[in-house]
Amino acid sequence: VVNWFKKNKRDLPWRNTSPWGVMVSEYMLQQTPVNRVLPKWHEWMERWPTPKHLASATPAQVITAWGRLGYPRRALRLHAAAQIIAEDFNNQVPEDQETLQLLPGIGEYTAAAIAAFAFEQRSLVMDVNIRRLLVRAIDGQEHPKPAPTAQEKARRLAILPTKNAHVWAAATMELGALVCTSKNPSCELCPIIGQCNWRKNGYPRTELVRKSQDWQGTDRKCRGTIVQALRENESLTESAIKKLWPDESQVEKALKTLLEDQLIQALPRRRYRLPQ
């Protein structure tokens, strides 16, 4: 797997950057594909090359710069984390996973990924691509469970290399992303096809649990429409915002949750803007 990775890996900029660059990429990649993250990551690193630079920005600048990456709360959490790092950690991303998890927006997975890819630590990175590759190769199943169980973590930790575990993590992640894909995997290109238990078992199918709600009518789509309009305007009245969406009650709900998440600010005379 590692030899395959050395020959076939993508030239992703956060593989040759500072710990801060790795951290920014991990926030962006949490729920957004690589091809959409690439241009935004370059923009952010050019504009805010260290935590201190981002810490000095306003929330409105941060949300606007986040663009259409989705889930803009990630931008505010990254902004808050940058302020803590600049103030409490001398502008240096902490190396310890427990300390990393104290920062806004960093859970167990993101802390493990930063530890591995920024500091070359032996940490258990349980990315969806890694999980899918290993559940097929080792367990002979098509797809992993929605969330890793304690048993799965223990089994994966048992096979984690003692040396260069960060390279193993990057290699298995890349193999899962490029070859052992969720749909239509390119098994003929896989370097471990001879050891794959899913193949040996005759490729048994596993039904994926999928959300049924159409994105176009979701509350998240409504929220995104409002935030995008406020990126493009200094402020908007509630009546103007309601014209952006066919369901007024959904707009009212979206405004309420956006205020709770501190993604927008209420102004006098029922106007709204991005937080300053």
Residues covered by each model-derived region:
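C-terminal engagement modules used by replication, chromatin/transcription, nuclear envelope/ESCRT
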Residues: 275-276
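Short amphipathic alpha-helical interaction segments
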Residues: 245-259
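A short, conserved structural fragment
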Residues: 259-272
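Catalytic cores of DNA base-excision repair glycosylases
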Residues: 3-221, 229-249
